Amino acid sequence: MKREKIALAYSGGLDTSVMIKWLKDKYDADIIAVTGNLGQEKEIENLEQKAFDTGASGFSFLDLRKEFVENYIWPALKAGALYEEVYPLATALGRPLLAKALVDVALSEDCTMIAHGCTGKGNDQVRFEVTFASLAPHLKVLAPLREWEFNSREAEMAYAEKHGIPVSATKKSPYSIDENIWGISIECGVLEDPMVAPPEDAYQITTSPEKAPDNAAVIDIEFEQGVPVALDGRKMEGLDLIVELNKHGAAHGVGRLDMIENRVVGIKSREIYEAPAATILHFAHRELERLTLEKTVFQYKNTISQDYANLIYNGTWFSPMREALDGFVDATQKHVTGLVRVKLFKGSVTLLGRTSPWSLYNEELATYTEADTFNHKAAEGFIHLYGLGLKTYSEVQANNRK
């Protein structure tokens, strides 16, 4: 009888290394380990050999960076998606792509089951499993961390030693860290107390603002229809542009975020994020929208931005709602083209200037100099009509009080 196959989202860490052996024994199945590169800086070399040494029957490494930027990050940037107005959704954006890649491998390898290493307390289990349900509802989903017998890292280490599973014996960081090109999330340890300032060792890439250079960096960012395309006059691919902005921002202490956020599972959590490029680009993009979007579109888009952010955070990327919102967002971005000049200095991003061929700012109408072309006499009639409803309301109230 043909053995069943399980596609496992594999990072090479302790949890997923132990999972290969555990799943293989529990389900008498072959394990296909799947790793996706979203631009994380942590060690991803030698994962194939490690997976095979741990007992995997197959291994798939997928470079997803370009797809991540073009099909996930840019749509979220155009939408202005910041969860609860702060978090640029780095981890949340990466999950549907990783889940999709896992499904693709599972289908190509004729797997009957699919497994992930998410805990039963976090958001990621929702994001992975909702994506699985959307793309391959026939696959059985396995979540070992919700059901296996290990209740501590030490128990997992003992299991690994017993079965000859190669895992790192170094001291575990007190923090839980997830990283991709759009940002880094940091939690646990002393960070669980919301009154404790994050220690410097919690931050992975950004310089402390106090230790950042005393000279500011000035950067010109060009956009075409809401998408960043150039830095300082140099046309760049999206991936390269984000990498360069991350370096500039991190060096100047930009992109440190500290928030209490509402998780999908109903609890509040304290999260620390580092997102230099995301912070800079969201800021610059919004300022260009202020210049180019008509008033009612600009104001209504705030609602759409929050809806889009919630959709990403809650794990429903592959949904009719996201496709519908993309239609609205794309329509708003047709004229979000131009240049934004920003200054990076000791943790802050400051606007220095912006210009666009689609600018709705008319200096002759806005000026208070002799060049003013605004018809001041028209204001009297406008104010009369604009306030007519309130005037009528007040008159009726006054008459009825007599």
Curated annotation (Swiss-Prot):
Residues that, per the record, bind ATP: 9-17, 117
Single GO MF annotation: ATP binding
SUPFAM superfamilies in UniProt: Adenine nucleotide alpha hydrolases-like, Argininosuccinate synthetase, C-terminal domain
A single GO BP: L-arginine biosynthetic process
Chemical reaction(s) catalysed: L-citrulline + L-aspartate + ATP = 2-(N(omega)-L-arginino)succinate + AMP + diphosphate + H(+)
Keyword tags: Amino-acid biosynthesis, Arginine biosynthesis, ATP-binding, Cytoplasm, Ligase, Nucleotide-binding
Positions annotated to bind L-citrulline: 87, 123, 127, 176, 185, 261, 273
Binding positions for L-aspartate per the UniProt entry: 119, 123-124
Residues forming coiled coils: none
Pfam family, one: Arginosuc_syn_C
Any one cellular-component term (Gene Ontology): cytoplasm
Principal cellular location given in the protein's record: cytoplasm
Enzyme Commission number(s) from the entry: 6.3.4.5
Pathways involved: Amino-acid biosynthesis; L-arginine biosynthesis; L-arginine from L-ornithine and carbamoyl phosphate: step 2/3
Subcellular location: Cytoplasm
Domain of life: Bacteria
Membrane-spanning segments: none
Family of this protein: Belongs to the argininosuccinate synthase family. Type 1 subfamily.
Subunit and interaction comment: Homotetramer.
Protein name as catalogued: Argininosuccinate synthase
